Amino acid sequence: SKNEFGLISLLHFDGFLRVLLSLMILDFIGAYLAHYVQHKIKPLWLVHVVHHSDRYVDTTTANRHHPIESFVRFIFTVFAVFVSESSIAIVFLYQSLSVVFSQFNHANIELNSHFDKVMSYLVVTPRMHKVHHHSYMPYTDTNYGNIFSIWDRLFGTYSELDKDKIIYGTDDNYDDKNDFFKVLKRPFKKD
């Protein structure tokens, strides 16, 4: 017999709606909420700042994470799997989409501004996410989304800024010179 314990079973969704709602729950808890919490809890921010310290945001930035951050995101994702009661196939689909969107969000590509604006009502676009990589507040604490942009709009964390005004990196001008071990030690350095 099948154990039904998640939100999807309570709502009795099947087929496409089940897949879509599962993806949305996984994205909300496993990406948006995890990302938001990493910005709000100082020890987690000290780990996440490794990602933000990149002064040249591109697709490599999407892969620039401290191993501790990967563990934190894993915990949130596992919780999201239980809440959504997602099948392994849906989890694989979500993880695949997450990787694609993370690369897309950090890519140095410029979409037609009208198309970008329309697209950003549904999904996170590079222009939208790059505001999040601005080195100064309040922009750093906006646009947390990974796949769906609805979360930032719904929770008031959406922000726009002209791309020419964005300065990448962190406000402390930390420069790791791409030294792998220096990057790994960054969360533990004394100020």
Residue ranges and their predicted role:
Residues 1, 8-9, 13-167:
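Membrane-embedded catalytic scaffold of the fatty acid hydroxylase/desaturase
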Residues 165-191:
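A membrane-cytosol interface segment of integral membrane proteins
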